[in-house]
Amino acid sequence: MPPAKKPTRRSPVKRAAPKAAPSKAADPKATQPVVEAGPVAVHVAAGEVAVVVAPPAPGGIDRRLFTFINGLPHTTTSDRYVSVLSDLGEGLGWVAGGAALAMLGGAKGRRAGVATAVASLAATYVVQQRVKPLFRRVRPFVNREARVVGIRPADHSFPSGHTASSFAAATALAFFYPRAAPLAYTVAVGVGASRVHLGVHFPSDAAVGGVIGIGIGTFSAWLFKKRG
């Protein structure tokens, strides 16, 4: 009989290593800082360049003043009235007052009413859409203890749009009716203080908002006074 053949060993089959998945390119829409030095950061998003300027951190006086105003007694009644005063800064109250003045105040009232309403709306737009995105200061209740009444706003803190709107309207109104200036500015100051008392703004937020509002209100009054 022929000799039995020895079984041949088969060399193990080498499996090809799995190909590495191609690296995904960075999403151009993702916002990434390209320059960040000190208080200024430059971001690129979807081909657009945005400059972010960090406002100075609230100083010691600012913090102490916030703690004092925010720590004033809170009662159900007082919080309700302060909240109503704060709501005037949203602009609807000033716009409604300006519309009433424009309809009932004759030729002068029309100019004053329109100037007041436009100033209030313009200040709200400038602060909310143009200034706040540059200064991304967080709200007081984010990094420190604060008594917050009502809604906790999700946007940035600096400057105060409510205060800017109120001072803009008060300035425009006082330009046409100087005798109304004390009352108008008292309400505007009250709006700014209410924002601090409710725990949603630092005093410096309200102060800078007031300055911006005065500038916009002056321009609005001058514009409609000239056109009239």
Predicted regions mapped to residue ranges:
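Interfacial segments of alpha-helical transmembrane regions
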Residues: 102-126
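N-terminal transmembrane-helix/juxtamembrane module of multi-pass inner/ER membrane proteins
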Residues: 1-97, 128-155
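Hydrophobic, aromatic-rich alpha-helical transmembrane segments
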Residues: 80, 84, 109-114, 199, ...
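Small-polar-interrupted transmembrane alpha-helices in polytopic inner-membrane proteins
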Residues: 118-132, 182-195
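Residues at alpha-helix boundaries and the short loops/turns that link adjacent helices
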Residues: 72-75, 91, 121, 125, ...
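Membrane-embedded catalytic cores of phosphoryl/pyrophosphoryl-handling enzymes
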Residues: 103, 144-228
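Membrane-helix interface segments
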Residues: 77-78, 108-112, 141, 178-182
